[in-house]
Amino acid sequence: MAEISAKQVMELRKKSGAGIMDAKKALVASEGDMDKAMDYLREKGIAKAAKKSDRIAAEGLTDIVVKGNTAAIVELNSETDFVAASDPFKAVLKDVANLIVDNKPADVEAALELKTANGTLNDDLIATTQKTGEKVSLRRFTIVEKNDNENFGAYLHQGGRIAALTVVEGADEATAKDVAMHVAAVNPEFLDRSEVSDERLEHERGIFKEETLNEGKPANIVDKIVEGRLNKFLSQICLADQDFVKDPDLTVEKYVDSKDGKLKSFIRYEVGEGIEKKQTNLAEEIKEQLNK
């Protein structure tokens, strides 16, 4: 049997919202595999599907710059939120975003080599690091292009902790921005159901079937219940099917359609998503309970 650490239990507990002993039991049953442990908890009805933003820790800000038919969404990281809120950091973030939208580099490495008044972008980041006393780094960016009959919607939440960029066809910029606000708030995974892979569908269907069987539902209605739960799940993760935050009587797709538009794409950044910081405040509590 795989040895289960307090850190693993803490991570699963944070992702799932399950109690300490339920998290430990799931990890034991899955031999320490975090994804399988999450599925185990879902099958038992203890946890829901984890959102993409479950593991967020790094500091920094995001920004969006739109120029004509090109837009760039950028994330710049720092070590503390104090530095991220400083004027030097915000200034270099805006410079970085403009530089990227103007030059369209292929990746972060190419972006760092872009020429600036002081040498290269990498030189500018080093200078900002020296000025702030913290490492300042370009983590990622995405360049988005649109056609003349399309509009960008750009929205920054909490001063740039979250950024959302959308493209809609036909509808105006205000509609596109409304959708961007929704994306920032709700965090969809996919544009619509056509983007969900068959593998993902079968995986979720299997989990819902186990969950339904564990509830003791009659065998003759299990499949119907499973498909109903799968349909609800898809309506929660696909932008087009989500209830629009500004008018829950409409889905996002129907809202855009009411403006004579069509959803084309979206991208959402949240500062530090997928990056973990060292955490110690809960570890001792978990160790104590694991050893009981």
Swiss-Prot record:
Keywords, A to Z, come to: Cytoplasm, Elongation factor, Protein biosynthesis
Q: Give a Pfam family name.
A: EF_TS
Q: Known InterPro entries for this protein?
A: EF-Ts_dimer_sf, Transl_elong_EFTs/EF1B, Transl_elong_EFTs/EF1B_dimer, Transl_elong_Ts_CS, UBA-like_sf
Q: Please classify the protein's predominant subcellular localization into one broad category.
A: cytoplasm
Q: Which GO terms describe its molecular function?
A: translation elongation factor activity
* Region annotation Involved in Mg(2+) ion dislocation from EF-Tu: where it falls in the sequence: 80-83
UniProt-recorded name of the protein: Elongation factor Ts
**Organism whose genome encodes this protein:** Limosilactobacillus fermentum (strain NBRC 3956 / LMG 18251) (Lactobacillus fermentum)
